[in-house]
Amino acid sequence: DMNRDATKQNSVEARILSAWADEIKPEFAFNLHDQNRLYSVGNGPEQTHIAFLATTGDEDGTWTPSRLRAGQICQRMLRQIQHIIPGKIAKWTDEYESRAFGDTFSSRGYGLVLLESGGAGWDLEKQSLRKLNACLLLDAFCAIADGSYVSESIEEYEALPTNERAIVDIKIKDAPLSSSVRADV
């Protein structure tokens, strides 16, 4: 997994990406992922369609200036789509992972926005989410170009429920395992 190769940089691609980022020193970086469609918004029944994260650069989760910029972009993107997919937006877990490029780039002062595409019902190819992502990215680029993102707070972003694993494909309740034992599996 190249995304977990930021520290050791065993792959050629990891070395190229790291060197290039250090050369250009971006104010912002975007990390786009497809997350498992079984993630839920908090521990509820709603499937997470989109999850955001203004990636931390240390184990304390410090809000550095670069992380704040990323948080303002997350806030902006959240405001753009919360009326389109209400109740289906979450925040990716904020645990620091030193091997990950997002966390590593954030520690170097690059405002890293993680954008995770989850599930959208039975749209298993995530085409509807890809369209949303394209719109979100275009809007974020415009907000960065004109500086309008700086007026964003991060309150709504911070209040987002986290991604959880509360959804399953199949749940069998009260299954007989033997004549005297029953269980949910």
Predicted regions and their residues:
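Active-site/substrate-binding loop(s) of hydrolase catalytic cores
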Residues: D1-G87
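C-terminal accessory segments enriched in acidic
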Residues: I24, L53-V185
